[in-house]
């Protein structure tokens, strides 16, 4: 297990869960079976690769949420490595969770157990195509990379021109750090092989979209009701990836 554990979901504050569910289902995402851990209204959609958690509660949103079964041990290790927590709940009588901000203010949370049933292995891609990255806007990619390196040491790709972009594995999900001025918020990226099908769904359902938004050659940007941005591309803008392990002992990793 990595220092972060396993990626669970892209969590986002959702004022109207039914409206957001409708948006994702029209694009071909599947609703997942949730547990009873959260007291607030909650739903999850997935394409088999990325899960989006819709939360009817106010928090620092969106958040990258990971599951780590030994949060107490992980929290001690992270604290020893200089991490500061925005919240920390560790007790035998509560659902254990913690949160912190990365160097650019993006929210990361860790919880002790799953909150929904995993997607079936045969869950099909959505009309957006194959998910390939969560992209985070950063001021300085190399500086942000130094923050993330102890938590996610497996580098997939680094591109220096025209803008610096780094991709690595964060708890088994591809995470990108981008200096592109066109990227305004944490966003989801997909490689779409059927543009016509996606365009038809956008037109048929009146989905909020913007053609050629200027981010890495995406041919369309979709805006979900709760604010999640989804980009569709003809190709992965970094091409083929390979994995390089840059750390032998990240904090909190299990031996």
Predicted segment positions?
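Short, flexible, glycine/charge-rich loop motifs used to bind or transfer phosphoryl groups or to couple energy/partner
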Residues: 1, 54-55, 124, 178-179
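Core segments of cupin and vicinal oxygen chelate
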Residues: 1-50, 135-173
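Vicinal oxygen chelate
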Residues: 6-15, 44, 56-130, 136, 156-162, 167-169, ...
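Alpha-helix boundary/interfacial micro-motifs
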Residues: 33, 45, 65, 120-121, ...
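Surface loops and adjacent helix of pleckstrin homology
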Residues: 34, 57, 111-113, 180, ...
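Short, isolated positions in well-ordered beta-strands
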Residues: 52, 174-175, 230
